[in-house]
Structures are given as structure tokens and as C-alpha cells.
Swiss-Prot record:
Name listed for the protein in its UniProt record: Large ribosomal subunit protein uL11
Organismal lineage: Bacteria, Pseudomonadati, Pseudomonadota, Alphaproteobacteria, Rickettsiales
Subunit composition and interactions: Part of the ribosomal stalk of the 50S ribosomal subunit. Interacts with L10 and the large rRNA to form the base of the stalk. L10 forms an elongated spine to which L12 dimers bind in a sequential fashion forming a multimeric L10(L12)X complex.
Keyword terms of this UniProt record: Methylation, Ribonucleoprotein, Ribosomal protein, RNA-binding, rRNA-binding
PROSITE patterns: RIBOSOMAL_L11
Length: 146
């Protein structure tokens, strides 16, 4: 039985992984063949999925075992990424709380919360909405009724 010796979290574009320095510098020293990983990742993330589409940033959790085998799980895009897409922003506020960069209606917040409910460890939609509102505030996005 092999034992997990490392766990790695990466943000990668769904369906667009290439064996470049960003991935190779993390996986290469641990003995993971980068081209094979990229091929498997692209195969998994290019399939139709309700939580993300090809090109979206997704969170990848890689478990590396002592026999140099690995497995990975893909979860949807981070909340901050989804909020920036909804608000059509390239970056969030450098000074949140004092500098607002966008306003989002509550309907957009609920949409993001529903999308992320699978990844969040919450029991109900209200808790997920509160978490997304907190992230929005920390990014300098004001939540308005609507």
C-alpha cells in the first residue's frame, strides 16, 4: 500500500494545461511525468461540466504517493474568480473597504453561491451566500439589492 507523501494545490486553466515551467517546477522534482499529467488533466477538464468551462481557472488538488504515482481532483473556480467574472473586473481592489471597484446585485451573489455549494462545506444556501458576500467585500465589491 502506497502512502501519500505530498499534497499540492494548483490553480490551472481547465482544458489548457501545457507542460511548461509553472507545472514542471512543482511536479518534476517529485517524479511526476508532467506531459502525462497535463494530458490526463486536459482530458478530465475538457469534458462538459456544470461548474466550469474550458479556460476557467480551476483548483487542482494533487496527491503524490511514495511510489511516485499520483491522483488529482478538480474543483470549480475560486469564488474570487467567479466574482471578477460577474463584475467584469480584471483585478480586485487594492484597498478593500475604502475603495470600491464594482457593485454586484444579490442575484449574482446567489448565482456564484449556488455554483460553489458543491465545493463549500456548508449545509444550506444562506451560509454559502454569506461566505460569498464576505469574499466580495474583501475584494472591494459592494453587494446591492436586486
Amino acid at each position: 500500500m502506497s502512502v501519500i507523501v505530498a499534497k499540492i494545490n494548483l490553480l490551472m486553466e481547465a482544458g489548457k494545461a501545457v507542460p511548461g515551467p509553472k507545472i514542471a517546477s512543482v511536479l518534476g522534482p517529485r517524479g511526476i511525468p508532467v506531459p502525462k499529467f497535463c494530458e490526463a488533466f486536459n482530458k478530465v477538464t475538457s469534458a462538459a461540466n456544470a461548474n466550469y468551462k474550458v479556460g476557467d481557472l480551476v483548483t487542482v488538488r494533487i496527491s503524490i504517493k511514495d511510489d511516485r504515482s499520483h491522483d488529482f481532483t478538480v474543483s470549480g473556480p475560486p469564488v474570487a474568480y467567479l466574482l471578477k467574472q460577474e463584475a467584469k473586473l480584471s483585478k480586485s481592489s487594492g484597498n478593500p473597504g475604502k475603495e470600491l471597484v464594482a457593485k454586484l446585485p444579490m442575484s449574482a451573489i446567489i448565482k456564484v453561491a449556488k455554483c460553489k455549494m458543491v465545493d463549500m462545506k456548508v449545509d444550506n444556501e444562506d451560509s454559502a451566500v454569506k461566505m460569498v458576500v464576505g469574499t466580495a467585500k474583501s475584494m472591494g465589491i459592494e453587494v446591492v439589492e436586486g
